[in-house]
Amino acid sequence: MKTKIVNGFEVVHDLIKLKWIPEILKSISHGNEKYIEILNSIPYMSHTELNRKLAILVDKEVVEKNNIENKYVLEEFGKDLVHIFYHLEDLEEKYF
């Protein structure tokens, strides 16, 4: 039986190892909630790749898609992941 820390690490690792996921979540956290805003805020990202990644994030309940307002909102899990991304950036600046 795996421990909570191992399970938690695996879940986070499965998401952050995917290209563009940190950038998408950080973009949403900065207020880019509409599809085109997210796309325009990330250089070199294609429509196809953004669609794929947003589908994964919705499926994993990291973001919620609001079809009425046509926007994406971070779930609590997504907010926690953004916090982790910023912490990792701080560690990189401090130690590398």
Question: What is each model feature region?
Answer:
Residues 69-88:
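Basic, amphipathic "hinge/linker" alpha-helix immediately C-terminal to the N-terminal HTH DNA-binding motif
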